[in-house]
Amino acid sequence: MSKASTFSAPKGVPDYVPPQSSEFVAVRDGLTRAARLAGYGHIELPIFEDTGLFARGVGESTDVVSKEMYTFADRGDRSVTLRPEGTAGVMRAVIEHGLDRGQLPVKLSYAGPFFRYERPQAGRYRQLQQVGVEAIGVDDPALDAEVIAVADAGFRGLGLEGFRLEITSLGDDTCRPQYRERLQEFLFALPLDEETRRRAEINPLRVLDDKRKEVREMTADAPLMLDHLSDTAKAHFDEVLAHLDALGVPYVVNPRMVRGLDYYTKTTFEFVHDGLGAQSGIGGGGRYDGLMAQLGGQPLSGIGFGLGVDRTVLALAAEGKTAGSTARCEVFGVPLGEEAKAKLVVIAQQLRAQGIRVDLAYGNRGVKGAMKAADRSGAALALVLGDRDIAEGTVGIKNLATGDQESVSSADVLARVGAILGA
C-alpha cells in the first residue's frame, strides 16, 4: 500500500507552533493592550468583503489593489476579496451600524490576519498578522499624536528599543491639487516606462513610492509635499509635532515618505527598525479625512494605524529579545502510578482554577521519561507523586531550575505552589 502524500502550508503563509506561538500571542496582546489603555473598543471584522470596498477605499492605482489582492467569485457570482488591510472594513462597519452618529470620536481596535499576494521573504508574508486602531470623527492634532503615542507605547511595552518613528504630512484638499500638478509636470518630463507613466496620471505620489532603483534615482529631486503645504495643513502638522514633543515621543521628519494606500491625508507616519534590512517597516498609518465620504458615509475625518505582529517578533529577535514566556506551563505533574495520576489530575485542575498553567505526564511514562517531559515543558516546578507520598499524605515539589525538592502535605500543596510562583 503506497504512503499517502502529505501537505504543506501554502507558500508565504506561516504556521506558528509552540514555543514560538507563545511569543506571537504575547506580541499581539501587548500591542492590543496599548490600544485598550487608550480607550479603544474592540471590533471584529469579516475576513472577506465586497471587492468594490477595497477598490474604492484603498485606491485602484495602488499595488495592493492592482497586484496583491486575493479576489474571487463566490457561489453567488459575487466578487469578494480577502481583506488586505483593516481601515476600509472598519469604516464600512461604522457606516453600516451608525456608529458615526453617536459619541465622537469612534475609537476602535482590531487584530487578526490580512492577505496580500506579495513575494514571500523574511517577515513579508501573504498572510500577515496586524493590530490596528482607528479614531473616527474628530479632526484634532492632539488625536493624531495620541494614535502615534499608542503605537509607540505598544512597541516599548514589549521591550523593543531600536525603532524610529518617521513622520510627514501629505497635505489637505487645498494644497494637494496644486502639488499634484507640480509633481506631474516633473514626472512627465522624465523617461518613464508606460506603466509608471500611467501611474503618474492616476496618482503621481505612487511613483515616489516605487521601489525600483532606476525610478528612485530619477525622482530624487522631485518636488516635496512638505514644501507645498497650505497654511492650515502646516499648522496642523506643526501642532502634531508639538504634541509628540510634549509626550516624549521621538520622531524624524521624512519629507519623502509615501504610504502604500491612496486614502492618506495630512499626518502620515511609519515605524521602522533597521535590524530588519530592506523590509524595515514594522507599522504605520495616518489620517484619512475623505475616506468615509468616499465610502458613502458622512464627511468625517479619521486617523489610524496598522502594526505588523510578524515583523515585531522579528524586530525583537534582531535585538536578541523575546516577548513573554515560551513555557507551555508553570507546573508539570509527574504521577508514578494510576492512583497518583488520578490525584494529580484533581490537583492540576485546582491549580488551574487559581490561574496557574499546569500540564501532566500522560501515557504511563516511567520516571525518567516523565521528568524529561517536565524539563521540555518549560515549567518552573514539577509535582512528583508516588505510592509512598500517597501513604504519607504528601506531594513532592521539585524546582526544575535548581533540582531542589521538598515535600509538603497534600492539604498545603495548592498554597505552597502559589507562594513559590507568586500567584
Swiss-Prot record:
Keyword Flavoprotein: no
Single GO MF annotation: ATP binding
Pfam families referenced in this protein's UniProt entry, alphabetically: HGTP_anticodon, tRNA-synt_His
Source species, domain of life: Bacteria
CDD domains assigned to the protein according to its UniProt record, in alphabetical order: HisRS-like_core, HisRS_anticodon
Coiled coil ranges: none
Subcellular location(s) per record: Cytoplasm
Transmembrane helix listed as a keyword: no
One GO cellular component term: cytoplasm
EC assignment: 6.1.1.21
Main location: cytoplasm
Recorded catalytic activity of this chain's protein: tRNA(His) + L-histidine + ATP = L-histidyl-tRNA(His) + AMP + diphosphate + H(+)
Any one of the GO BP annotations: histidyl-tRNA aminoacylation
Alphabetical keyword list: Aminoacyl-tRNA synthetase, ATP-binding, Cytoplasm, Ligase, Nucleotide-binding, Protein biosynthesis
PANTHER family the record matches: HISTIDINE--TRNA LIGASE, MITOCHONDRIAL-RELATED, HISTIDYL-TRNA SYNTHETASE
Assigned protein family: Belongs to the class-II aminoacyl-tRNA synthetase family.
Subunit structure: Homodimer.
Protein name, entry field: Histidine--tRNA ligase
Organism this protein belongs to: Rhodococcus opacus (strain B4)
Gene expressing this chain: hisS
